[in-house]
Amino acid sequence: ESYLSWNWLAGGGSTSSNSDGSITSTVSVNSTAGFSIVSYTGTGSAGATVGHGLGVTPDVIIIKNRTDSQSDGGSYWSFYNSSMFNSAADCNIMYLNETNAPSDDTNIHGTSVTINSTVFSLGDYNGTNGSSDNMIAYCFSNVEGYCKSGTYVGNNNSNGPYIYTGFKPAWLLIKGLINDDWAVFDNKRDSYNLMTRHMRLSTSATEYVAAGSPPVELDFTANGFKHRNSNGQINGSNTYFYLAFAEAPFKYATAR
């Protein structure tokens, strides 16, 4: 059988205690790449804060309960992105293991959301702040030439939109801000354009290849990605979230 692995380097094995928040966390940080892994123990109380160690405000925060079973919220991967943050009282959340549209769930990051250069806040949801439960968070910040997240509007056309990232992507995650699945593309399974092979995160299905009618198709370019079909998974008449990482970080790339 064939397997697929995506890997990010945080602190290279070193960790440190972080007391910036009301909950003391253990962090492994790669500040150059804008990435930290944050381990903490939940309190079950809304309003708690956790230090993430990045030194800049994270644009993506993924949190998972490591202790509880599926029925107690242990199966949910909460997903925050700064492009969906409207105000401290209106912070939309998605879940990596679900297809649901973003929702303003105050149980995740609290009724008055704080996400800044030192901490992120928590509500009382068991999946992100279960009492005495072991939690893990992955924090990413946009870094010029390496990591870019945001949104775009599809045009439902075979000559689809071009999304500028400032680098040639190696890895790309897309989700429509409707009830739709997460699609992940990378430069290892499709080493040349067109890009058609993708995984869908909320399903246990095998790899999708040119799935749909019309099929899912896009190009990785020197400075972003270009849609080549009108498939609703990534280019219908909707707004889409994306997260991309560079093939050659902080260097000039060429088209392929």
Per-region residue spans from a language model:
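Surface-exposed molecular-recognition determinants
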Residues: 1-256
